[in-house]
Amino acid sequence: MKITKTELFLRLAKPNEQGISRWVKTSEFAGEYKDLKLGNGGSWCRKDSPLARDYIVEFDKGLTSGNSIDAIRLNGFNQEKHFKQYIRKDIKDALKTRNCVMLGVNGKSENTKIEIDHKDGRKNNHRVSDIKTQKLEDFQPLCKAANDVKRQICKTCKETNKRWSAKNISGNPYAFYMGDENYSEELGCVGCYQYDPVEYRKSSVKRIAAEAAKYTSDYIFKKLYEEDNG
C-alpha cells in the first residue's frame, strides 16, 4: 500500500518523542523519497497540510541563493487548534450540481468544473470546520476559475485587512452589502461580494428599491405641494 507524503517525510526525518527532527535537506528527496520533491511551493508541507496540523514545520532558505526551500525540520508538536477543510457529504451533494454563483457555469473542463467553496475565506470559524455543526449556507458552488481568483482576493484581504470592493465589477451599485472596506472581527467576511454574491445581489435590489421609493415620494410631494415648500 502506497504511503502518503507526510508518512514518507516522517520516515526520513525521524522526529523524536517531542516531535523534533533534524534538518532534512531537500537534496535528500531522491530515490525512495523522490515523491517529496518540492513543486508549486511544496503542498505536502504547507501550513494547511496534514503535516503542519500535527507538527511545527520550519524551513531554511539560506543554504543556497534564491528563495527556494533548502531544508525542512519539525520543531515539536503543533498545539494550535487547526481549521479542518472537510465538508460534509450531504452539503457537497446539494451544491455540486448547481451552477457557479459568480460565473453561472457548471462544466467538465478544468476551469468550469464546480468546487465547493468555504464562503469565509479566512477559514477561522471552527463551527464551520466541524462537520457536525457546519451548515449548507456556510458554502457556495464556484467554478475552479472563480474559486482561484477568490482565493487570491481573500489572501490580499488577510494581509491588508482591506476588503474587496464589489464596484471593481462594472455595474455593481454598491461596494459592500454590509460594512465597509475595513475588515472587522464583528462582521468578518459578511458583506463582501466574494463571501456571498447571491446575497449581494438580493441586498442591492432591496436597497435600490428603497432608494427609488424615497426619491419618488420626495419628488411627488415637491410636485404636489411646491407652494408649501416655497
Swiss-Prot record:
The keyword Nuclease belongs to this UniProt entry's keyword annotation: yes
Domain of life the protein comes from: Bacteria
UniProt enzyme class: hydrolase
Reactions catalysed: Endonucleolytic cleavage of DNA to give specific double-stranded fragments with terminal 5'-phosphates
Species the sequence originates in: Neisseria lactamica
Keywords: Endonuclease, Hydrolase, Nuclease, Restriction system
GO terms, molecular function: type II site-specific deoxyribonuclease activity
GO biological-process terms attached to the record: DNA restriction-modification system
Pfam families per record: ICEA (PF05315)
EC number: 3.1.21.4
Name this protein carries in UniProt: Type II restriction enzyme NlaIII
